[in-house]
């Protein structure tokens, strides 16, 4: 590491973009029961030495809390990204043989924040349009291979699951707008990037249309349940983005703790 690079990193501000994981945190109905932690070894008297130990077990779906979707997560007519057909040779009881999360490289990229909720409160279940995204993008340039994070404002409701699950999300046309920008990955401070409660998209014949457009057709990973509140408060619209998916063989997603350095 060069001295100039070291100075720039140590003097920068680091933003933690992960939401707190706790029992009872918001969880998508398809990924219930969400995060649970159980202490199975306890510090206790009675041993023959001074040292004691404690450890626990984490039980959670891969798509709980702040996480990234791998390309195996969604299919369109049983076809994954790249034309890979979902059959017994690809999808097994212990995971996917292709496009699992272990195939995803660590993401280190320029990141941009589109603070759609910056100047207004978005209604529950509101579908964010290309015009909304373009208006937020007036504060920052989107370049190819950027990671684009969309703030709905609902990340501040993480401690209120019922309200959080009615978050605004990006519309199908909004996802198409992002694809046209040739971004590397996208994310949002909501449960599914899309609007969870939206009706089936007539063109795609699917709910959560962004999942088909981004993951299946464009091969663009999706980050969900981000904490973007401090980033927005600091008006940090451009930053260095880091995200390291866990190498879990065959998994369709991974918990992550992304950070932004600005």
Report the location of each language-model feature.
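Active-/binding-site microenvironments in catalytic and ligand-binding cores
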Residues: 1-262
């Amino acid at each position: 590491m060069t001295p100039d690079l070291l100075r720039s990193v140590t003097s920068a501000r680091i933003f933690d973009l992960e939401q707190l994981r706790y029992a009872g945190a918001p969880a998508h109905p398809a990924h219930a029961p969400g995060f649970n932690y159980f202490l199975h070894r306890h510090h206790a008297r009675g041993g023959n030495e001074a040292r004691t130990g404690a450890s626990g077990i984490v039980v959670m779906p891969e798509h709980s809390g702040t996480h990234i979707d791998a390309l195996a997560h969604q299919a369109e007519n049983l076809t994954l990204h790249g034309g890979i057909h979902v059959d017994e040779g690809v999808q097994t009881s212990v995971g996917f043989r292709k496009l699992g999360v272990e195939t995803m490289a660590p993401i280190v990229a320029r990141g941009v924040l589109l603070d759609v909720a910056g100047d207004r409160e978005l209604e529950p279940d509101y579908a964010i349009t290309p015009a909304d995204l373009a208006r937020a993008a007036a504060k920052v340039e989107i370049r190819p291979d950027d990671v684009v994070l969309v703030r709905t404002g609902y990340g501040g409701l993480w401690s209120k699951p019922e309200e959080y699950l009615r978050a605004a999300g990006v519309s199908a046309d909004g996802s198409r707008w992002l694809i046209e920008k040739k971004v590397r990955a996208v994310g949002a401070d909501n449960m599914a990037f899309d609007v969870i409660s939206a009706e089936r998209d007539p063109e795609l014949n699917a709910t959560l249309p962004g999942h088909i457009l981004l993951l299946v057709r464009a091969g663009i990973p999706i980050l969900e349940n981000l904490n973007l509140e401090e980033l927005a408060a600091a008006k940090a619209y451009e930053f260095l983005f880091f995200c390291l998916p866990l190498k879990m063989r065959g998994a369709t997603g991974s918990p992550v703790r992304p950070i932004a350095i600005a």
